[in-house]
């Protein structure tokens, strides 16, 4: 639309979009509802001049309502984002690949991350920061001094503590809205199925080939997407296994052992 100010833009958009837009976004006096976040070129309008903010040719205006509507509801018990969540995740909601509905899916998701070491540390931190609703972290190890140069979630005061217990405390501080489950268990053929049960995605950040085979087998049995990654020195690999759609980990690497 062609508009000189944000207020002018709202007036013209409401005329074009009709009653549904007005009901969701505007108060009776035509001003934006309190649960609406407005961004102009990535900057929150509330920190500018509000509705009097001047617009230029090419400006991009994002209107993010805090209430989802009708068929856009993404799952049980999660139908909207709070005003605080909209503000917190605003920079990623603006991405076309995520958007409002994508953020709802993240809030609804349950992700299991197995291994909270060199790979798992940044993975669980990013998942919690971006608003994944439920994260299950699995690792039986304790924190060692030699971990600290790459496992930056931990510090010297944490040495000797169980990794998942310490990680869970720090993740809850990072994002109190995320549910963190910690399991200080080993992964093997007897435990893997129970570990992944009920999760939407499993992320493998293990340092054991035998444990990875067991995790792969459990994900295939439960039909859970399995993201696996490994690093040796300065090289690494990462790929996603989709049960019944792609090759599994054992299909790709049928004869690995801990030594090789």
Where are these regions (language model features)?
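Ubiquitin-like/PB1-type beta-grasp interaction modules and other compact soluble beta-rich domains
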Residues: 1-73
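Adenine nucleotide-associated cytosolic modules
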Residues: 73-260
């Amino acid at each position: 639309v062609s508009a000189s100010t944000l207020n002018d833009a709202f007036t013209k958009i409401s005329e074009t979009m009709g009653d549904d837009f007005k009901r969701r976004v505007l108060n009776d006096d035509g001003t934006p509802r309190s649960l609406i976040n407005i961004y102009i070129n990535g900057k929150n309008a509330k920190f500018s001049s509000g509705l009097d903010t001047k617009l230029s040719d090419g400006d991009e205006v994002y209107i993010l309502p805090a209430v989802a509507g009708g068929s856009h509801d993404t799952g049980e018990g999660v139908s909207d984002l709070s005003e605080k969540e909209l503000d917190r995740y605003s920079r990623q909601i603006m991405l076309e690949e995520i958007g409002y509905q994508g953020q709802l899916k993240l809030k609804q998701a349950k992700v299991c991350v197995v291994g909270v070491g060199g790979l798992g540390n940044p993975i669980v931190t990013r998942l919690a920061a971006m608003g994944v609703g439920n994260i299950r972290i699995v690792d039986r190890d304790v924190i060692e001094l030699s971990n600290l140069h790459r496992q930056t979630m931990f510090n010297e005061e944490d040495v000797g503590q169980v990794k998942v217990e310490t990680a869970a405390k720090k993740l809850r501080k990072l994002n109190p809205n995320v549910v963190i489950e910690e399991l200080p268990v080993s992964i093997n053929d007897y435990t893997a199925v129970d570990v992944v049960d009920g999760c939407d995605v499993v992320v493998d950040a293990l340092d054991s080939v035998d444990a990875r085979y067991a995790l792969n087998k459990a994900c295939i049995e439960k039909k859970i997407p399995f993201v696996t990654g490994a690093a040796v020195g300065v090289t690494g690999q990462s790929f996603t296994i989709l049960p019944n759609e792609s090759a599994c980990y054992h299909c790709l690497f049928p004869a690995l052992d801990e030594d090789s």
